[in-house]
Amino acid sequence: VLTSDSQALPLAQKVQAQLAGATGLADRGVKMADFAVLRQTDMPAILVEVGFISNPREEQLLKEETFLDKAAVAIAQAIAAHLNHPWKN
């Protein structure tokens, strides 16, 4: 998970932790990045990289619907927790 804004750091940390826990992938931590997609926003922003196609195992996982569902739910749960919004399945 990447961010360029210290205000977005708590959200980025929640998403990273939830994503690593749900998917079983390595927790690569949150990194600061000066990307336009993060920098040119009017609100705190994060960029989530669920996996990398340069990694054969992750490439295969990115093709699996169950893995993508786990990742999507993990991201949504982290955002809901960050907003103090109860999560409903």
Which ranges hold each PLM region?
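Active-site-proximal helix/loop segments of hydrolytic enzymes
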Residues: 1-89
